[in-house]
Structures are given as C-alpha cells and as structure tokens.
Amino acid sequence: MSLIEAVILGIVQGLTEFLPISSTGHLTLAGKFMGLISDKNPEHWTSFIAVIQLGTMLSIFVYFWKDLWGILTEFLQQNLQRRVQYSKQSTNSKLGWMIILGTIPIVVIGLLFKDMIEGVLTKNLYVISGSLIVLAVILAGAEKTAKFKKNIEDITVLDSILIGLAQAVALIAGLSRSGTTITGGLFIGLKSEVAARFSF
C-alpha cells in the first residue's frame, strides 16, 4: 500500500464514519477497486480497518469528552464509592450501565464468529452492496414508523441490549454500526437525536 492509497482510504473513512452508510463497507469497496485486498489473507484487511478506525474513535472521544467524563465519574462514584441503589442513580451513572450492557452482544458475537468476520465473505462486493441496500430500506422504514418519544433518561436495560444486538449485526460487511444502532433506537421509540447520540 502506497502513501497516496493510505491517504485516499483515510479520506473515505473520515467521510463515511459519521454517516449511517458503513465506513467499513466503503473502505472495503475502495480497497477492492484499488487491488489492496488479498483473498488468501483477508484478515490483513480486517486488521488494517481496525487500525484506521482508531483515528475516528479518537475524534469521537474528543467531541464527546464532557459527556463521557460525566458518565465515567458518576458511574464510578455511585457504584464503587457510594454504592447507590440502581433505581436512585443519576442518568449518567445509568448510562454507564447501558453502555456496558449494549457492548456485551457485539463482544460475544464477535468472538464467536471471529473467523467468519475476518474471512473472505465479509470482503465480498455482493454481500457489501446487498447489505448497504437492505440497511437503507430498514432505516427508511424505521424513520416512517418510529414513535420518537423516548429521551436519553428513558432508555431501559432491555433497550440497551436490543441496541447492542443491532450493533452486533453490523459485523456483517456493508452494515453500518451507527446505521444499525440508530435504526434499532428508532424502532424502540427513541427520538432521532437521542438514537444518534447514544449510538456514538
């Protein structure tokens, strides 16, 4: 991979990460067209994607650092120091639990299907294209049928698990992590801005 190719892929990642259109899918499409993906060693491309996404993760931490710091400090204070009963905890502390619960499905499924995720199937252009179309249709359906009632403090344990399962679905090539989680959030009744914020 040349420096110019790396820059192009970085631009693709930056343009697609914060939209519900699968940055991984678009990176893989670009990698395929540029001849950078080996069918013999597809796991090398998976590793590259993991590394390139560290940059966008850092930008998310910078943008949401006040929110994340509030969640972290209140979670630690109310669960480790003061041991406050869950029902009496602050919204930020409860969000800490929701984030943990919402992360469990993708960790478990990711470990169980590690070989398939790193394999050739997730680099297949037909799989990626089909996934992009399917997600677009489902997201459009969610926008039309959603109730848009719930605020951030209304998110329940079940809601966070369902959103976590939606996130795990994004392990399929072409399905956007933010797209699936936002769609899941809309289907359970979250307001669109709340679904987007909780997704990131």
Can you say where each PLM-predicted feature lies in the sequence?
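Multi-pass membrane proteins that catalyze or facilitate reactions on polyprenyl-/lipid-phosphate substrates
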Residues: 1-200
